[in-house]
């Protein structure tokens, strides 16, 4: 039998001694989802990041917002490239292709997402071709100086009036010295009818997490697995909403074969392929043991709102999505899920309706009819699903929960430690986007003139730790918390800071100072008592099993004037009990983990022993995050 409790003490702005006594019973039980991840297509975190596809602009997808183009592509061998919208395209979803015309060796090269990582491993690729051609294709990975790391011949199956897929593998013999590499695809144009061929959906994947086809980048998934998130909030974020109602994220256009996914204009300045679609998100949840999700709520970022009389079709779309995810194979959309390789339904316990509907002039319609329409329909058909509003700025019906977002300066995170103390547990809150983004300035964030840090920095991360302890202290009211945004490609980003930063070289991936703070947190809470009055009530973690009897204490020290002496006792723990005390610090308050740089977070673990009356005595330095675990 397993019983879990949680204690998370806050130590802030004091240097006097602190005495803490931890009780055995009482406290608040969490949802078990206390910390999670948030993903939306921003910062090329999916396209060019977590989604392992190496070819940028692989299918020339475009929209009225971002028209089709030849970004990342260059002609090879003096050939010419031209975009085509043929009468018989690869598919209606992918109508635009590239025509390569030349004489002799001709082709196309791609620079990837600002580089392609090359190392001794198998790369799996494919491309579609239309046109009469009796020769062969050459696919290769090359350095910018022309050095060839791997090359293979692909016999042509191309015909005049149809699109034919060709597959290949590449296995370099050595690792490239940098990621300044290209993928090159060539053919002998003299053997092609009219000296030209049409190409589309040119793809190349490295080995993926769990070797899933169309899968995820291994180093980023490893960083996420090491963090251990318990839920995934997706697909946004603003990207869920779209700039217009028609431009919203449509779940049914992100499933099925890649040839049937049209892609869409993100709200962050570029087109996405939808290669990382609903099923891939759910497989991500499966692989890391996380829970989902969000649905669209009838609001676009441009302020357009679906009128009440027209909302039913969008509510039905949300129900169809839930049927696709959870329905039996006897249902219409459950059968479609099975067709796409997942006969076993997924379990959905939470659905968030929309994103930040208190913004973009959306709150009035959200309160008056939009949220209620989704809430009523979902709870009627799926009574075991908890429906969350995308704001807490409204009166919530039934058992609905809310979502609260906080981007702020570190000092304001400290002042918000107790903000949930008086909040009702009848409507639990998801802290769906949380981050210290800007240095202390005595005021807060001016959203018309922001000065966000490139990376999380140590002072901000410690301030986040303080706020998180306040959230865990109210664990009966808080469903879970996630940093946001989570990922950033340093070569092309729209928002910083993020939990994890990266470029095309997996060796350069940086787990931020905030990653290290979040990595320390637990799940269930138990009150503690203290004879000191330095701040809010203290909390502790205790875990009992048939084989172990352990306790965990956690603390964050923010802006103290000197080391803080701590005397800690756990009820039932006596003299001589040993514990491991791990203290996280950094060289300075502005220390940060940069892409390609060393980890600045210093972790020191020491063994300590309880003295008389079971007292653990130790000191915590300023700007530290600590964990004590009894043995």
From Swiss-Prot:
GO cellular component: extracellular region
Pathway: Glycan metabolism; L-arabinan degradation
Catalytic activity, EC: 3.2.1.55
Subcellular location: Secreted
Keywords: Carbohydrate metabolism, Glycoprotein, Glycosidase, Hydrolase, Polysaccharide degradation, Secreted, Signal
Coiled-coil parts of chain: none
Residue ranges of the TM segments: none
Primary location: secreted
Reaction catalyzed: Hydrolysis of terminal non-reducing alpha-L-arabinofuranoside residues in alpha-L-arabinosides
Database matches in Gene3D superfamilies: Galactose-binding domain-like, Glycosidases, Golgi alpha-mannosidase II
InterPro entries on file: Alpha-L-AF_C, ASD1_cat, Galactose-bd-like_sf, Glyco_hydro_b, Glycoside_hydrolase_SF, Glycosyl_Hydrolase_51
Glycosites: 28, 85, 180, 252, 358, 531, 559, 622
GO biological process: arabinan catabolic process; L-arabinose metabolic process
Superkingdom, taxonomy of origin: Eukaryota
Keyword Nucleotide-binding included in the entry's annotation: no
Pfam families: Alpha-L-AF_C, ASD1_dom
Molecular functions per Gene Ontology: alpha-L-arabinofuranosidase activity
Post-translational modification: Residues Asn-28, Asn-85, Asn-180, Asn-252, and Asn-559 are highly mannosylated with up to 7 mannose residues.
Cleaved signal peptide residues: 1-17
Keyword Glycosyltransferase: no
pH-dependent activity: Optimum pH is 5.5.
Temperature-dependence annotation: Optimum temperature is 67 degrees Celsius. 50 perscent maximal activity is exhibited at 75 degrees Celsius. Reaction time was 10 min.
Free-text function comment from the UniProt entry: Secreted alpha-L-arabinofuranosidase that actively hydrolyzes p-NP-alpha-L-arabinofuranoside. Exhibits significant activity against polymeric arabinose-containing substrates such as arabinan and arabinoxylan. Also hydrolyzes low-molecular-weight and polymeric galactoside-containing substrates such as galactan, xyloglycan, and p-NP-beta-D-galactopyranoside.
Family in the record: Belongs to the glycosyl hydrolase 51 family.
Protein name: Alpha-L-arabinofuranosidase A
Taxonomic lineage of the native organism: Eukaryota, Fungi, Dikarya, Ascomycota, Pezizomycotina
